[in-house]
C-alpha cells in the first residue's frame, strides 16, 4: 500500500482545507465489509472514478466504487479549481508528435471535456459555482509573445477564438501585481469549487444506481474472470476493473506505476479580503508560467486561494503556510501581512510528456490518469470515455491510448 494514502492524512478524513470546510457536513459512507459482485469495480472516487460510475450506471451496468478515504479526498477535492483548455502540452507540439489529423481530433476531445464538465456541474453540482475565465500570466516579454502566438494559432487552425491577449498594461489592470509582462485570458476555460463538484458527482452516480464505499482501500487486484479486488474487510468480484487512482495509485498496477509519478502541490487560503479587487479586478482564475507555477483565484467568500510550491517526496513539509506564503508575497507584496487561515497539500499524477495515460493494464482492466494538472476537465471526460469503452465503443479510448508516455527513468523503483 502506497505511503501517499496515509503519510499526510488521517484515515477516512478530509484535509483541513478551505474546500472541505466550505462543503458542509458530509457523513461518512459505509465501508465494504462483505463479499459483493458487480459488472464493474472502480478504484477511487475522484473525478475519473465518479464520472465512470455515473456514466456506466446510466447505461445499466452494476457498479461498485471503492474509495480508500472519502469522495474527492485526493487531487479532485484539493486542487486549484481551474478547468483549462487542452492538454498540459502546447497544441503546436502535439501536432508534431501526433500529426495534424490526430491533433485536431484530440483538441476536439478536450473541448468536449470542458463542455461535459460544465454540463455535469449544471445538472448535478450547481453549488460548485462555475465561473468563466482563466488568465495565463507571463513573466517575460518573450513568454508573452509566445502566448499570443499560441492564441493566434488556435484561432487560425482550430477556430478557437476565446483567448484575449494581454499586454503589460492590460494585465496590470487585471492582476494587481508588478511581476507580469502580459499573457492572455482564456474565456473558454473557467474555475470552480472542486470538492463540491466531486460530491455532486457522487450523489448523481448513486442516484443512477452505483454503490460507493468509503474507507475501503484496495489491497490487491487478482486478475481473472472475474477479477477479484480485496480490501481490508471485504471483496469485490467484477468483470471489469477501472483504476481511477491517479497519483495515489498504490502500485496496484505496475504499468500505471511506471508511467505516472506522484507529485505534491500546496495551497493556502487567506482571510476574507476587504477589497478583492485590490488583487484581481475580474472574477477569473490565474496561472502563471513559472516551471513550478503559481495559481490563484478569489473564493465565493472573498478569500484568495493561492497555490505555489511542490515536492516529490512522500511527506508534505511541516509548515505549508510558510512554504506558500513566500510565492504569494512575491506575486502580491501588498498581502505580506495577510492572515492565512487554511493550508493543505495534495498529490497529483504527472507523466514524462505531461499527456494523460489511457491504457489497458490487465484482463478487462482499464486506467486513465496522469492528467498533469489538467484533470478538472480531463478526468471527468476520461470517465465518460472509460464507460464508452466498457460498453463496447473504444474509438476515443484507442486514440487517447496512443498519446506518448514513456516510463519514468528508474521505473517504479524511484516512486
Feature map (PLM): residue ranges:
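Helical element adjacent to the flavin cofactor pocket in flavoenzyme catalytic cores
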Residues: 153, 179-239
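Short beta-strand to alpha-helix junction loop
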Residues: 108-111, 139-146, 185-203, 213, ...
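Glycine-rich FAD pyrophosphate-binding loop
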Residues: 58-78
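Helix-loop-beta segment of a Rossmann-like dinucleotide-binding subdomain
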Residues: 29, 126-136, 170-204, 208, ...
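N-terminal Rossmann-like FAD-binding beta1-loop-alpha1 element of flavoenzymes
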Residues: 38-65
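Extreme N-terminal leader/targeting segments of oxidoreductases
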Residues: 1-40
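Dinucleotide-binding Rossmann-like beta1-alpha1 core, especially the glycine-rich loop
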Residues: 86-169
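Active-site substrate-recognition segment that forms the wall
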Residues: 115, 123-131, 218, 234-274, ...
